Regions:
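Short beta-strand/loop turn elements enriched in aromatics
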Residues: 1-17
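Short beta-strand-centered aromatic/proline hotspots
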Residues: 3-7, 38, 50-78
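Short, solvent-exposed secondary-structure boundary/capping segments
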Residues: 14-19, 79-96
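Short alpha-helix capping/helix-loop boundary micro-motifs
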Residues: 15-30
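Short, well-ordered loop/turn sites that connect or cap secondary structure elements
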Residues: 31-35
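Charge/polar-rich, low-complexity and marginally structured segments
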Residues: 102-232
């Protein structure tokens, strides 16, 4: 589900998403869909591709692979320019909405997203997606302004964390749990990122019960290091 669009970037891996407000989309996102620690994806479009190409491929029944940047929401800002502004107001909010329906409100919910890696998926019939490749780390391409931010369901989050490497030779692949973005998160300067890391581990414990013992060790070690750094 689309929850908003990219309106700004602070770096190559940190982006600001403005959550869709009333009348901006058919289904307005609820707070749980842009909660702290929520995994999201943003389509990365090559420069040569446009909407006409997508329509042409759809008519021919051809579906090209799509690359997504995968990120996590780690901060939320409520923007209200009217706060602290003194003086009389000629109209209240209800009157403005009634008599000036084209008025653009400046209030917004902004979420900060840190990109953790990339996924390439192949759209299939029936709206299903087949994951072709996964990468953890810094992507080569940046996102575009106004790109839609979509939530990821549990299955997509699992696919993002399950790597498959040839183990016993050609044709044999053993899947394993991978969190290659952890050093990438730790290197950033934000007081909220360590907490979002713990939140990510909590989610993975639910999604990968077979790896509960391993994830519990990782969480305890990370929480201990966080406590040591906080207390100095």
């Amino acid at each position: 589900m689309a929850i908003g669009k990219i309106v700004k970037s602070d770096s190559h891996i940190n982006y600001v998403c403005q959550i869709f407000g009333p009348h901006e989309t058919d289904i307005q996102p609820v707070p749980a869909e842009y909660a702290f620690g929520r995994f999201v994806r943003i389509a990365v479009r090559p420069q040569s591709q446009d909407g006409a190409d997508d329509l042409y491929d759809e008519v021919l029944g051809q579906r090209q692979p799509v690359s997504y940047a995968v990120g996590v929401i780690y901060n939320t800002i409520l923007q209200n320019p009217a706060f602290g502004v003194l003086g009389p107001r000629l109209s209240n909010e209800m009157q403005v909405e009634l008599f000036s329906p084209d008025y653009v409100t400046e209030r917004a919910i902004l979420t900060y997203i840190m990109v953790l890696g990339m996924m390439e998926v192949q759209p299939l019939a029936g709206g299903q997606l087949e994951v072709l490749s996964v990468m953890h780390g810094i992507p080569l391409l940046s996102l575009s302004l106004d790109s839609e931010v979509e939530t990821m369901d549990d299955e997509m989050v699992r696919q993002f964390h399950y790597f498959r490497d040839p183990a016993g030779g050609v044709g044999t692949q053993e899947p394993y749990l991978h969190m290659g973005y952890i050093p990438h998160i730790i290197a950033q300067h934000s007081s909220l990122l360590p907490m979002v890391t713990l939140r990510i581990i909590d989610q993975l414990e639910r999604l990968f019960p077979q790896h509960l013992a391993l994830l519990s060790i990782v969480k305890r070690n990370f929480a201990w290091h966080l406590k040591v750094e906080t207390t100095g």
